Amino acid sequence: MAWPCISRLCCLARRWNQLDRSDVAVPLTLHSYSDLESEEPIPGGVPSRRGPSPAGSRDPGRDVPLTQYQRDFGVWTAPSGSRDATQGRGPGASSRRTKPSATPGRGVYVLPIGDADAAAVATTSYRQEFQAWTGVKPSRSTKVKPAKVITTHSSGWDGSPRAGFQAPEVRKKFAPNPSAIFQASAPRILNV
């Protein structure tokens, strides 16, 4: 199969729709399907497990290495408390700008609110690895200088445009075209 013509808008749209969605998707924050189960917290603070954990599930006590994305944008784990308490609606909830305490819980990562980690964002590896492309030439000026006509001889011509201008009348009689349908003279009526 040949490559599509990417000069047309329909081909461009078709090509973008066929891209791998994982390249531009938001990363999934759940590490295993067991995180999706609704778990009731035990008064001791440890979430209950209904059975043996699957082989792919994450152990809450184990340290998971941070990804490059997590290092660059300063994420932390969300507390495993009730939903109202994490959103600041529960009893004893503090202001919205305070960071939630990192407790070993379900392992869901949350991005910070506001400028909490501005220093971490300023020192990302993307900024360190950036190199400006040197192959760029400066753009040319788009202003076009008006051309001036310089005459070497003087004439009796007045500079105003209407001084003596007269449009030439050209009357040309065209040769008759026998294949033309409506070439009849005006008073003649064609019966179709």
UniProtKB/Swiss-Prot annotation:
Feature: compositional bias, Low complexity: 43-58
Role played: May have microtubule-stabilizing activity.
Keyword Disulfide bond in annotation: no
Region annotation (Disordered) ranges: 36-106
Family: Belongs to the STOP family.
Subunit structure: Interacts with calmodulin.
GO MF, one annotated term: microtubule binding
Organism: Bos taurus (Bovine)
GO cellular component entries: cis-Golgi network; Golgi-associated vesicle; microtubule
Subcellular location: Golgi apparatus; Cytoplasm, Cytoskeleton
UniProt protein name: MAP6 domain-containing protein 1
Region (Mn 1): 123-136
Domain of life: Eukaryota
Lipid-conjugated positions (S-palmitoyl cysteine): C5, C10, C11
Keyword vocabulary terms for this entry: Calmodulin-binding, Cytoplasm, Cytoskeleton, Golgi apparatus, Lipoprotein, Palmitate, Phosphoprotein
InterPro entries: MAP6
